[in-house]
């Protein structure tokens, strides 16, 4: 019997500099699971090594605002003078295919998604071992002016207070460890009764004594 398995929408969120992209990429390399990354859109400039359509859809302010008007985003937010958003259609297509869809989004965007109460959605809050690690990582990027780093740290202090609203909190002490924890979370989510009961009932329908 072929069992139906719906994909999960996995929201990986946390303060800027916590390592969301690094952990997600490591997770994808560690397993051949049915994972896909939903590429977000932004109006900020690409960082060194980032590719349009792979890391982000890099849009102009006018293009992004037109997308807002046309209801093209599942969620969107403005962060330090730049828009960030999640294109809606690609996520819907992936979930219909039974794929596990990963979103890396800002805390404000995750807050908007929680209010939508979407089914089969798991919210994971990624945190550093120490707050100072955020400053060190942002500084190491070399892409931010000091004033922007200070703004991001101030925003992060407020975002930490929202961690209790997430389904899971994962500490990014080591990238591989954080990725392992997220894989374990996904397996546990699929085993929950509310997601597996229909397939279990289908198994019970089989007559194992049939000749």
UniProtKB/Swiss-Prot annotation:
Xref: InterPro entries: GK/Ca_channel_bsu (IPR008145), Guanylate_kin-like_dom (IPR008144), Guanylate_kinase (IPR017665), Guanylate_kinase_CS (IPR020590), P-loop_NTPase (IPR027417)
Gene3D superfamilies: Guanylate Kinase phosphate binding domain, P-loop containing nucleotide triphosphate hydrolases
EC number(s) from the headed UniProt entry: 2.7.4.8
Catalytic activity: GMP + ATP = GDP + ADP
Keywords associated with the record: ATP-binding, Cytoplasm, Kinase, Nucleotide-binding, Transferase
Binding residues annotated for ATP, in chain numbering: 14-21
Residues annotated as domain Guanylate kinase-like: 7-187
Location within or outside the cell: Cytoplasm
A GO-annotated cellular component: cytosol
SMART domains, A to Z: GuKc (SM00072)
Function: Essential for recycling GMP and indirectly, cGMP.
Family as reported in the entry's similarity comment: Belongs to the guanylate kinase family.
Protein name in UniProt: Guanylate kinase
Organism lineage string: Bacteria, Bacillati, Mycoplasmatota, Mollicutes, Acholeplasmatales
Gene responsible for this protein: gmk
């Amino acid at each position: 019997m072929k069992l139906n398995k719906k994909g999960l929408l996995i929201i990986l969120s946390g303060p800027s500099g916590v390592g969301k992209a690094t952990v997600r990429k490591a997770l994808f390399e560690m397993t051949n699971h049915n994972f896909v990354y939903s590429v977000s859109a932004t109006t900020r400039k690409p960082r060194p090594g980032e590719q349009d359509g792979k890391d982000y859809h890099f849009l102009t302010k006018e293009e992004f605002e037109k997308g807002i008007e046309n209801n093209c985003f599942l969620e969107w937010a403005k962060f330090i003078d730049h828009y960030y958003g999640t294109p809606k259609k690609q996520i819907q297509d992936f979930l219909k295919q039974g794929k596990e869809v990963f979103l890396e989004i800002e805390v404000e965007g995750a807050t908007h998604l929680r209010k939508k109460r979407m089914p089969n959605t798991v919210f994971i809050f990624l945190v550093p071992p120490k707050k100072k690690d955020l400053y060190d990582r942002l500084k190491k990027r070399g892409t931010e002016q000091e004033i922007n780093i200070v703004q991001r740290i101030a925003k992060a202090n407020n975002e930490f207070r929202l961690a209790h609203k997430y389904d899971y909190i994962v500490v990014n002490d080591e990238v591989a460890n954080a990725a392992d924890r997220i894989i374990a979370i996904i397996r546990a989510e699929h085993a929950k009764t509310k997601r597996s009961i229909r397939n279990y009932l289908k198994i019970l329908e089989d007559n194992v004594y049939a000749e």
